[in-house]
Amino acid sequence: MAEHTATLITGDGVGPDLADAARRCVHAALDKTPGAGTISWVVCEAGLDVMETEGTPMPEATIQSVRETDATLKAPVTTPVGTGFRSVNVLLRQTLDLYACLRPCKSYPGVRSKYQDIDLVVVRENCEDLYAGVEFEKGLPETAELIETVNRLSTDKKVMTEAATTGVSIKPISVANSERIVRFAFEYARANGRKKVTYVHKANIMKFSDGLFKQVAERVSQDYPDIEGEERLIDNMCMQLVQKPELYDVIVLPNLYGDIVSDLCAGLAGGLGVAPGANIGDNGAVFEATHGSAPKYKGLNKVNPTALILSGVMMLRHLDERPAADALENAIAAVIAEGRNVTYDMKPHRDDPTAVGTREMADAIIAAI
């Protein structure tokens, strides 16, 4: 029997309610599965609440725990828009080099959706592309200098706008980061019985950045003759996903495209309330819901826990506790399909008086394992 350690980041807003629900469900799945291992939890804080007491949204003790434990389950945390502290998610990804964002998108009977046969996985590169954060604000001398330098060095393409009114973002795409994310996608496909990996780009326009990603993906795909590899342009990919999502299996993309497409695919499957996720690297694996912290519902025992519990399913599979993971996912699916012990957003009408709370839905899932 394996003995695992895991960090539980309780988050803020509705995070503590969801963290408790997911932790109890993961424990129950292990307890009820013969031969399954155990998990010892290290409870840590991150986000707005700890920022107010410690002056940082991500204490060093939390980062160290993520490094030292076998996996991390993270509840939602608040990210201020436009002002305030940096995103905790970005801090974790950059500090620990969690280079792969994994977003399974799967439809479950009972979840309102236009599609009933979604079962695909989005793999997003986490560390570079336009999200590298290398930006130059309009009106600054260094921005004008950058534009002047680009115009001087480029023989045929010029920045045609006024430097004083132009902001610039840099889009780095490297061989090393492209190779490891594409290889991650193919390895994931092989380990999980997936048959196809689609690598997505806009190389017809951005020939030296997306073109590089495409070249690397084509080369890496040759190392996996048992997995079909194919390419798509990002705009065509979006149309194809809306028209024929059943044709796709594992999709791997650079950072910006991956951010957009992962939410698109979550929408195909019913929304962020049923969308789990993970950020994985050589220094840690963080499993999390992809929705926000909903501060207005803090402490109200109201919000749907499905996404974070499904993230717990992903964590169990990462820990090689597959029978327990399957048992928990089957229990989630059964509760959703029955439609009785579900939160307000999963009822046919959001004001349905029979809707249950976060805690009660978790109780129903535990009973169904």
Question: Which stretches of residues belong to each language-model region?
Answer:
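Glycine-rich phosphate/nucleotide-binding loop
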Residues: 48-50, 240-341
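Buried hydrophobic positions in well-ordered alpha/beta secondary-structure cores of metabolic enzymes
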Residues: 12-15, 70, 123, 185, ...
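Flexible, glycine/charged-enriched surface loops at secondary-structure junctions
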Residues: 35-40, 192-201, 224-232, 321-329, ...
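Short acidic loop-to-helix transition motifs that present clustered carboxylates
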Residues: 232-239
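N-terminal beta-loop-helix "entrance" segment that forms/cooperates
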Residues: 34-59, 241
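Glycine-rich phosphate/diphosphate-binding loop of Rossmann-like nucleotide-binding domains
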Residues: 7-24, 28-29, 33, 145-232
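N-terminal glycine-rich phosphate/adenylate-binding segment common to multiple enzyme folds
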Residues: 50-157, 167-169, 256
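Phosphate-binding loop/pocket of nucleotide- and phosphate-handling active sites
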Residues: 354-369
